[in-house]
């Protein structure tokens, strides 16, 4: 194992320790700021939240550098043979390390930077200049983060409230959402009880009622009329109370009225 590879592995371990330390500090800082958000003024809350955002960006930068350093440690043989060129698949990792080494207080990274500059020459040092090496804009935004915008600060504040005060978050997040009754009023919706039935449904209900009445009348007439046998005369049927006593109805071919059918039904009940 060469000296360059040893320094790269030590740099990866140092970055991991530094990242874990920053994560613990950021967690404590977020908790302290979240507990004071209810009493802070908007300007003070913004001033307290901006450092938290910058710290999160720094942690993300350390995570990226840790991966890049481990990749370079596995490709150390190529670097030492001066076989590196722009067509290498790990060139972005080398650019990241060369640009971040002068900005971070990690001596192992500084050693890797100085070693590669001496090995490849002074032209290789231009990779550490963000104005000249513009191959990865997203990385340089992590290395030189801009001032957080107001929208980002407000979103971070809401996230803190949601994390540390979950009972207060729904009230703030859903304050503009109307209730179900208000939504019905806004949409002019009628309840199912007050809603008028369509005309076709009314006609169907009326037709069903008429059919039920006609069916009841037919049943009454069947129960009231006698069974006509050839050997049965009118006198025997009248004596057995199957026919009415009114002689005008005995030989009538007309259909009985509703009152007549009702009278027959009453007589049948008394049998």
From Swiss-Prot:
Q: Name one GO cellular component term.
A: mitotic spindle pole body attachment site
Q: Where are the transmembrane segments?
A: none
InterPro entries according to UniProt: Ist1 (IPR005061), IST1-like (IPR042277)
Ranges annotated as biased composition (Polar residues) = 226-255
Single GO biological process annotation from the record: protein transport to vacuole involved in ubiquitin-dependent protein catabolic process via the multivesicular body sorting pathway
Q: Which UniProt keywords apply?
A: Cytoplasm, Endosome, Golgi apparatus, Nucleus
What Pfam families has UniProt attached to this entry? Ist1 (PF03398)
Tell me where in or outside the cell this protein is found: Cytoplasm; Nucleus; Golgi apparatus; Endosome
UniProt superkingdom: Eukaryota
The UniProt regions of compositional bias labelled Basic and acidic residues, in chain numbering, are 192-205
Annotated region Disordered: the residues are 189-255
Q: Do the record's keywords include Lipid biosynthesis?
A: no
PANTHER family xrefs:
IST1 FAMILY MEMBER (PTHR12161), IST1 HOMOLOG (PTHR12161:SF5)
Q: Family, per the entry? A: Belongs to the IST1 family.
**Described purpose of this protein according to its UniProt entry:** Involved in a late step in sorting of cargo proteins of the multivesicular body (MVB) for incorporation into intralumenal vesicles. The lumenal sequestrated membrane proteins are targeted into the vacuole after fusion of the endosome with the vacuole.
Spell out the protein name for this chain: Vacuolar protein sorting-associated protein ist1
Record the organism.
Answer: Schizosaccharomyces pombe (strain 972 / ATCC 24843) (Fission yeast)
């Amino acid at each position: 194992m060469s000296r360059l590879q040893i320094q790269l592995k030590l740099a990866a371990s140092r970055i991991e320790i530094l990242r874990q330390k920053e994560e613990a500090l950021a967690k404590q800082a977020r908790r302290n700021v979240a507990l004071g958000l209810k009493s802070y003024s908007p300007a003070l809350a913004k001033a307290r939240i901006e450092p938290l955002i910058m710290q999160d960006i720094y942690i993300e930068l350390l995570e990226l550098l840790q991966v890049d350093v481990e990749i370079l440690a596995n490709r150390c043989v190529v670097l030492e043979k001066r076989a590196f060129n722009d067509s290498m698949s790990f060139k972005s990792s080398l650019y990241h390390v060369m640009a971040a080494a002068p900005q971070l207080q990690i001596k192992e990274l500084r050693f890797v930077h100085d070693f590669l500059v001496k090995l490849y020459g002074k032209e290789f040092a231009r990779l550490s200049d963000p104005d000249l090496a513009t191959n990865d804009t997203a990385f340089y935004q992590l290395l030189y983060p801009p001032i957080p915008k107001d929208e980002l600060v407000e979103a971070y504040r809401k996230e803190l409230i949601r994390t540390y005060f979950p009972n207060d978050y729904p009230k703030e997040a859903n304050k503009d959402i109307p209730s179900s009754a208000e939504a019905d009023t806004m949409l002019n919706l009628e309840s199912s009880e007050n809603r008028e039935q369509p005309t076709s449904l009314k006609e169907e209900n009326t037709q069903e009622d008429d059919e039920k009445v006609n069916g009841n009348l037919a049943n009454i007439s069947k129960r009231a009329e006698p069974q006509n046998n050839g050997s049965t005369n009118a006198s025997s049927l009248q004596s057995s109370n199957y026919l009415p006593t009114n002689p005008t109805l005995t030989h009538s071919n007309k259909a009985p009225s509703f009152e007549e059918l009702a009278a027959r039904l009453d007589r049948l009940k008394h049998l």
